[in-house]
């Protein structure tokens, strides 16, 4: 039987779904296979350690990924929880490094120089608090990354006016 071309407009919704179903299923399988291949690449060292010189099946890859994630989670729990201050400091440092990297990638403008100078300045002494901080309050950020910002900028100018902040 020769293939026939039928106008899609003439098909009923039920027939359209029947034609579309294999295409959708193939796309779903392709996504699954792609994700399994990415897992295999991410966990390549783990696979080499447990099963050297073996052809891994998809089920093996998924089992190894689950095992690795469980092991990683248990290891992180055994290391102990981070304090809020440490967690905040790490996040602040990472954000500051990203901002400095972004600012140094582009041609220097007056605004960029002001921002970089602002990142380099030591923090102003905090006013004494009338009440003790709440348990969930964010601690003061670590300023070790401010030194990294200073090293990233070879020249720093004193800004003529204060830096505008939206807060």
From Swiss-Prot:
A motif (WRPW motif) lies at residues 164-167. Residues 139-160 have a biased composition (Low complexity). The keyword Iron does not apply. GO terms for cellular component: nucleoplasm. Residues 124-138 have a biased composition (Pro residues). One of its GO terms (molecular function) is chromatin binding. Residues 88-119 form the Orange domain. SUPFAM superfamilies: HLH, helix-loop-helix DNA-binding domain (SSF47459). GO terms for biological process: astrocyte differentiation; BMP signaling pathway; brain development; camera-type eye development; cartilage development; cell adhesion; cell maturation; central nervous system myelination. Residues 124-167 are annotated as: Disordered. The keyword Transcription applies. Residues 16-72 form the bHLH domain. Keywords: Developmental protein, Differentiation, DNA-binding, Neurogenesis, Nucleus, Repressor, Transcription, Transcription regulation. It is found in: Nucleus. Has a particular type of basic domain (presence of a helix-interrupting proline) that binds to the N-box (CACNAG), rather than the canonical E-box (CANNTG). The C-terminal WRPW motif is a transcriptional repression domain necessary for the interaction with Groucho/TLE family members, transcriptional corepressors recruited to specific target DNA by Hairy-related proteins. Transcriptional repressor of genes that require a bHLH protein for their transcription. Plays an important role as neurogenesis negative regulator. PANTHER family: BASIC HELIX-LOOP-HELIX TRANSCRIPTION FACTOR, HES-RELATED (PTHR10985). Transcription repression requires formation of a complex with a corepressor protein of the Groucho/TLE family. This is Transcription factor HES-5.
